[in-house]
């Protein structure tokens, strides 16, 4: 309960505050002004701004004070670390509230994954709220580890940290009023529904919004953003590791629309979290691009709080939670002090807290693969022409190529000369024995194999290799370590990064994970993989059958334009 008696008495100056930040330039989220004065805090809440005395004081000597930043949509799993370690990265960067979608771990572990995320993200000096995964499995052309219907989601919808339904990717299900989709919308009625519908417009967009969808984070152009804003949606401006849209969308933010715009990172990988930070990086980018500073700060704070109905967050004002950032300048946006509920939790970029033990047994031991049958790795050739997945530098979309490929004994074979490697996806959740096999062009791999259990959206095991023997060796290594990333050559494991939590997250620190990632990248480069590709990010999206043009799942080669499985051989 809010300590009303204490708040009133401190606000009136009848008793000292627990904490006073003196001589600050305080950002007012409502007027966009910086006002010189003190900030008084009692029992984790702001009692007032002005002139106050307290038991503990910090003389800020004119430093700038803002509310804690809010990330409106992020997948913790993309950081490859557990929630507590994720918090240790976000909090020093100034993000004190994150709205997460546990879509990735739910695809592996179902309701156990959601329960783990709720438990592992509690009792941390950061507000972590959940949006329930709306599309598990994401498509019918892959095998996920779980199926989440409206019935499963109803178990969580009234949890105090569950705010609604996560990104509604299945917009055809909405537009065609599929029965199960209508049930999910009914279960979450009265809660928020986040959108995910790039490219649709006109009456289809209108119908999608009419179903109850409130926001969109997939816009890539200002025109697309304006159409959504004009129809009442909130706009999430995204700057992730894989997809960066902030600068393209800023022109859609003006004095009429700004209050319905806020920032999200969606996916931030370890290197970016360490080097760039979180929402503070987006604030810096936007201001550097010429955006109005007060508007940008509102987008990082009060706008997101209002959208998510978190009415005690996003402002330095009486009765609000004392989630406070202190900056020495407004160029770099690196907080000197970070206060959560009035307690100092980070200083000069360093967290002042650790995690706590969490029972994660329900999301470990997720490598449920049948014994590998080498025959399943053979690709029959009716001719010497094949459908080949063509990689595009710095893109997650691929090209649908038709190439001449070497054939031996009636089967397609890899070719270093033609830069053609074999790609395989092994189902790893249900012991089905499913293996999808195809060919890719452009990776540059000369020998060996690289493999990962981070493979959107179902997170099966994906491996690219030049020989079946190394592909099998890579699979066996990932089984041994409980999931993760590995590189193999000549039957020898050259390096691995264990991700034992659902095959998606490490139980080690962010810095340790990044160090191992860098080692793996160096090894992969030595095997010939081009600098144009982040090898494991590339692998992670090669099995996502909703991103054009050709993808591979455990069920086979998918032509995204027809949403069907097609043979490799032409």
Swiss-Prot record:
Pfam families: Adenine_deam_C, Amidohydro_1. The keyword Hydrolase applies. Its EC number is 3.5.4.2. GO terms for molecular function: adenine deaminase activity. It catalyses: adenine + H2O + H(+) = hypoxanthine + NH4(+). Keywords: Hydrolase, Manganese. GO terms for biological process: adenine catabolic process. The keyword Membrane does not apply. This is Adenine deaminase 2.
């Amino acid at each position: 309960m809010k300590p009303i008696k204490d708040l009133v008495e401190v606000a009136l100056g009848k008793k000292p505050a627990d904490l006073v930040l003196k001589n600050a330039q305080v950002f007012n989220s409502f007027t966009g002004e910086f006002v010189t004065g003190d900030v008084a805090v009692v029992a984790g809440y702001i009692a007032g701004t002005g002139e106050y005395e307290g038991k503990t004081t910090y003389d800020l000597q004119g430093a700038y004070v803002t509310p804690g930043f809010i990330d409106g949509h992020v997948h913790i799993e993309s950081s490859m670390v557990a929630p507590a370690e994720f918090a240790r990265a976000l909090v020093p960067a100034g993000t004190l509230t994150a709205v997460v979608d546990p879509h990735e771990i739910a695809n592996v572990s179902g309701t156990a994954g959601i329960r783990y995320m709720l438990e592992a993200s509690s009792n941390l000096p950061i507000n972590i709220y959940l949006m329930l995964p709306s599309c598990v499995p994401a498509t019918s052309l892959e095998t996920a580890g779980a199926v989440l219907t409206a019935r499963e989601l109803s178990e969580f919808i009234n949890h105090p940290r569950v705010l609604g339904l996560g990104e509604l990717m299945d917009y055809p299900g909405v537009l065609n009023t599929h029965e199960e989709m209508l049930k999910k919308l009914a279960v979450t009625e009265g809660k928020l529904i986040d959108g995910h519908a790039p490219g649709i417009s006109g009456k289809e967009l209108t119908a999608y919004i009419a179903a109850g969808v409130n926001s969109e984070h997939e816009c890539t152009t200002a025109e697309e953003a304006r159409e959504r804003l004009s129809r009442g949606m909130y706009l999430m401006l995204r700057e992730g590791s894989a997809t960066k849209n902030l600068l393209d969308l800023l022109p859609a933010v003006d004095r009429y629309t700004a209050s319905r715009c806020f920032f999200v990172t969606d996916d931030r990988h370890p290197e970016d979290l360490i080097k760039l930070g979180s929402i503070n990086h987006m604030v810096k980018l936007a201001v550097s691009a010429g955006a109005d500073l007060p508007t940008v700060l509102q987008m990082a704070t009060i706008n997101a709080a209002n959208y998510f109905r978190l009415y005690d967050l996003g402002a330095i004002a009486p009765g609000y939670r004392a989630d406070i950032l202190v900056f020495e300048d407004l160029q770099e946006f690196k907080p000197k002090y970070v206060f959560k509920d009035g307690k100092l939790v980070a200083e000069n970029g360093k967290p002042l807290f650790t995690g706590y033990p969490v029972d994660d047994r329900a999301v470990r031991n997720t490598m449920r693969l049948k014994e590998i049958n080498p025959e399943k790795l053979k690709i029959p050739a009716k001719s010497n022409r094949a459908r080949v997945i063509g990689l595009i530098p710095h893109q997650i979309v691929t090209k649908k190529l038709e190439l001449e490929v070497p054939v031996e004994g009636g089967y397609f074979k890899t070719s270093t000369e033609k830069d053609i490697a074999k790609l395989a996806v092994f189902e790893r959740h249900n012991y089905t024995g499913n293996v999808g096999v195809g060919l890719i062009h452009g990776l540059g791999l000369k020998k060996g194999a690289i493999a990962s259990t981070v493979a959107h959206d179902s997170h099966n095991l994906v491996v690219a290799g030049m020989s079946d023997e190394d592909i099998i060796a890579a699979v066996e290594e990932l089984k041994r370590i409980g999931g993760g990333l590995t590189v193999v050559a000549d039957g020898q494991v050259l390096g691995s990064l264990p991700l034992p939590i659902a095959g998606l997250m490490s139980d080690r620190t962010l810095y340790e994970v990044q160090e191992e990632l860098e080692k793996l990248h160096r090894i992969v480069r030595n095997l010939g993989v081009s600098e144009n590709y982040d090898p494991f990010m590339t692998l992670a999206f090669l099995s996502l059958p909703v991103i054009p043009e050709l993808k591979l799942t455990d069920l086979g080669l998918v032509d995204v334009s027809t949403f069907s499985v097609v043979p490799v051989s032409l």
